[in-house]
């Protein structure tokens, strides 16, 4: 399974993939998709997990404030499931902490 993100900053191969806080796989590769020029994240999901719906969403999350980046999956309501090689299109990119701090400082400075 793969997912396309606007920004995959800080995510690397072997990062964990979770569902409801439980690790169900790992990131196998992070690259640029040649068609969309978005960050493409390939994931290996445990074979026991065969219930990811077509409308599953993926978010790049951070463990703690400055911790490791990982993928969090959320299952949708669709009854059909993702096949091997499917691409998750409903994604939330990494929150870049430097951008967030910069925005807070700008706002505090009377911006």
Indicate residue ranges for each PLM-predicted region.
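Extracytoplasmic/periplasmic terminal helices and flexible tails
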Residues: 9-13, 28, 37-40, 46-47, ...
């Amino acid at each position: 399974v793969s997912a396309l993100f606007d920004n995959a900053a800080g995510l690397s191969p072997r990062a964990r993939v979770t569902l409801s806080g439980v690790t169900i796989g790992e990131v196998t590769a992070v690259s640029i998709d040649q068609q969309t020029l978005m960050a493409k994240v390939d994931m290996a999901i445990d074979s026991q997990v065969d219930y990811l719906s077509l409308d599953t969403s993926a978010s790049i999350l951070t463990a703690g404030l400055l911790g490791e980046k990982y993928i969090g999956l959320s299952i949708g309501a669709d009854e059909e499931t993702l096949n091997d090689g499917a691409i998750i299109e409903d994604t939330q990119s990494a929150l870049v902490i430097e951008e967030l701090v910069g925005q807070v400082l700008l706002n505090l400075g009377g911006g």
